[in-house]
Design a protein with these regions (language model features):
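A structural signal for small-residue-enriched, beta-sheet-centric alpha/beta enzyme cores
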Residues: 1-75, 79-92, 99-407
């Protein structure tokens, strides 16, 4: 597997565009269009929040009940959530606009939104935006970057990644763009992720691969513990790489799934590290668990602990907060068997052994915790299972960003 420069247009046959449709103020980019030159098989995973935004319902219908998809229209600034039948109707009108502009079936258009909940989409601006973006569609690196910028809300930077693999003597590319900074606690973040590949793979196996990698990538991210109404991961495959079609769990499927995992893991870490107001990516690994479920529960409990996140912001080795978060997670373990380490580019330091603090240097601990990526590793010595979750520190700016969000 090779990481390459690129984003959503890295794979053969995919084009993208981004621009300002007037949804946001002051001419900020707020709309993106992704298009495949040929129809794609599509897969998706979606929010588990009972309150589902209209685009989520639309996309579930397309992904689960239609054979192909060919375009994605995404706006930022308004979530189109809690908007009733009118909001769902606007998804249909968005698809109609894209269908007319691109000469593709209406039911091959996927729709996504992110932003303020409760406002109706300005459908005239969306329709005009599609017309504006259509002639700008391109397979260039610049087009991909512009599209990635257009789906941002409180993100501080666009999030893109691409990889290449060899399957059946053919080069297969997977590219992606995503957004997410606040309201990040998926259980499948607001999190939107769009992945495009030229792999030749059946719809069934594409969905299987996505469903298998999401639990250990996006579902292991938390910025603030809030699960969005709009969480969506969409994966399109157009087959233009020309590899033998993947129709079963063979070696080709394994290679593809590993690459898909790497793309989504990288994007999950991008989201966590760009949490609203964040100054550090906080990674938590649980080792020695009896089961994967136990390890996941413990890691997520630590990553969502506000007190622990605040300590990371303060570069404070307050290990008691980590042990406390593990203790109220609901997972059973013996606290007197826990070893805990802090690690970063500045070094690695054992903080507790068998549940008791060792004689460590607070100065060294502070140095380690002052890096932009910090890892806490807890070994509970009960088995062989492990899990890793990603979050960020909790800063003053998080409160300021969210207090001022609608203004």
């Amino acid at each position: 597997m090779k990481k390459i420069e690129g984003g959503i247009t890295a794979a053969k046959g995919f084009q993208a565009a981004g621009g300002a449709a007037g949804i946001k103020k002051q001419g900020v980019k707020d709309m993106a269009l992704v298009y495949s030159e040929v129809p794609c098989v599509a897969a998706g995973t979606f929010t588990t929040n009972i309150v589902k935004a209209a685009p989520v319902k639309w996309d579930q219908e397309i992904v689960y009940n239609h054979p192909t998809a060919q375009a994605i229209v995404c706006n930022s600034g308004i979530a189109n959530a809690c908007t009733g039948e009118e909001g769902y109707g606007y998804c249909r009108k968005t698809a109609e606009a894209a269908s007319a502009a691109l000469s593709i079936p209406e039911d091959s258009v996927l729709v996504a939104s992110t932003g303020v909940i409760g406002k109706q989409i300005p459908i005239d601006k969306i329709a005009a935006g599609v017309e504006m973006l259509k002639p700008q569609l391109a397979a260039t690196r610049e087009a991909a970057a512009t599209a990635a910028q257009a789906i941002m809300t409180t993100d501080t930077e666009p999030k893109e990644v691409a990889v290449q693999i060899e399957i059946g003597g053919k080069t297969v590319t997977i590219g992606s763009m995503c957004k997410g900074s606040g309201m990040i606690h998926p259980n499948m973040c607001t999190m939107l992720s769009f992945v495009a590949t030229d792999a030749n793979i059946s719809k069934e196996m594409l969905q299987k691969a996505l469903s298998e990698v999401v639990p250990d990538t996006y579902n292991m991210v938390s910025v603030d513990g809030d699960t969005s109404t709009n969480d969506t991961v969409l994966l399109l495959a157009n087959g233009l790489a020309g590899n033998p079609e993947i129709t079963e769990e063979n070696e080709d499927y394994k290679i593809f799934k590993e690459a898909l995992f790497e793309v989504n893991k990288t994007q999950a870490m991008h989201i966590a590290g760009d949490g609203e107001g964040a100054t550090a990516l906080f990674e938590v690994t649980i080792q020695g668990a009896e089961s994967k479920e136990q390890a996941v529960t413990l890691a997520k409990s630590v990553i969502t602990s506000s007190l622990t996140k605040a300590a990371i912001f303060g570069h404070d080795a307050n290990w008691g907060r980590i042990l406390c978060a593990m203790g109220y997670s609901g997972a059973k373990f013996d606290p007197e068997n826990v070893d805990l380490y802090f690690e970063s580019a500045a070094g690695k330091l054992q903080i507790i052994t068998k549940g008791v603090a060792v004689d460590y240097s607070e100065e060294e601990a502070t140095k380690i915790l002052s890096e932009p990526k910090v890892t806490a590793t807890a070994n509970i010595h009960m088995g062989e299972a492990t899990a890793t979750a990603w979050g960020c520190d909790l800063t003053y700016d998080y409160v300021k960003i969210n207090a001022d969000y609608r203004s």
